[in-house]
């Protein structure tokens, strides 16, 4: 049994990863700033209130976990909206992960993926919606910070397909494809994956590690 601590375990991706992990018999510590009224009750599931920017909390959770999962929205931060950049939380996360020999898995975004070999990034294309550039840029910034990490933490960053989110939950198929830094599309040009199949790929990486200190992407 693996102990998995999920920051953002009540969100769209985090809850899917939580449920997949619990279904495999793992212990899950779900860290959230506010416990939802409909929080599930399950064997092996524990909720803790807290924030990923609390370095002391990160340290205590890392001491118990085999894997730390960061599944929190990449708010732009620094814009007066009261939200901090997730990149600012990464130093304490990587340090704690390295200290306690825990893996660090990050739910990333698709916008930092290249649209084809040689670029550009999806984020940098003219068609990319302006209203999402702040969040997408924050996710890309976090990936850059991980790539520059010097703690030696064993991290992995999983970029989903372009059409991934609660607006497009899809249906579980039990299948997915893995790529590297280039956006994956199907034969009709669509880039999609359901929440359940993204979680399947994420927990497969936890159970059978194949990616170390790198980003990979999953899609149909």
Where do the protein language model's features map onto the residues?
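N-terminal Rossmann NAD(P)H-binding glycine-rich loop of SDR-like oxidoreductase domains
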Residues: 4-24
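Conserved Rossmann-fold NAD(P)-dependent oxidoreductase catalytic core, especially the SDR/UDP-sugar
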Residues: 29, 91-134, 148
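Short, polar loop motifs at secondary-structure junctions
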Residues: 30-38, 162
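NAD(P)H-binding glycine-rich loop region in Rossmannoid oxidoreductase-like domains
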Residues: 36-100
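Conserved catalytic-site region of short-chain dehydrogenase/reductase
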Residues: 77, 111-116, 163-167
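Substrate-positioning beta->alpha
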Residues: 138-139, 189-203, 214
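Conserved beta-loop-beta element that borders a ligand/cofactor-binding pocket
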Residues: 144-166
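Glycine/proline-rich active-site loop of Rossmann-fold NAD(P)-dependent oxidoreductases
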Residues: 151-152, 165-174, 205-214
């Amino acid at each position: 049994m693996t102990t998995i601590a999920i920051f953002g375990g009540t969100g769209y991706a985090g809850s899917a990863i939580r449920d997949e992990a619990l279904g495999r018999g793992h212990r899950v510590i779900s860290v959230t700033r506010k416990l939802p009224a409909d929080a599930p009750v399950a064997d092996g599931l524990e909720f803790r209130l807290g924030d990923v920017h609390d370095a002391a909390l990160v340290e205590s959770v890392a001491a118990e976990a085999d894997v730390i999962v960061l599944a929190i929205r990449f708010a732009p931060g620094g814009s007066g909206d009261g939200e901090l950049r997730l990149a600012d939380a990464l130093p304490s996360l990587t340090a704690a992960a390295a200290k306690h020999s825990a893996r660090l898995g990050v739910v990333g975004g698709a916008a930092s993926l290249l649209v084809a070999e040689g670029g550009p990034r999806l984020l940098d294309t003219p068609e990319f919606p302006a209203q999402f550039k702040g969040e997408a840029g924050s996710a890309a910034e976090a990936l850059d910070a991980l790539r520059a990490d010097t703690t030696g933490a064993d991290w992995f960053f999983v970029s989903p397909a372009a059409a991934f989110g609660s607006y497009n939950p899809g249906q579980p198929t039990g299948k997915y494809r893995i790529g590297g830094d280039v956006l994956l599309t199907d034969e009709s040009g669509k880039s999609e994956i359901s929440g359940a199949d993204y979680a399947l790929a994420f927990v497969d990486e936890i159970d059978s590690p194949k990616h170390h200190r790198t980003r990979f992407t999953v899609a149909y």
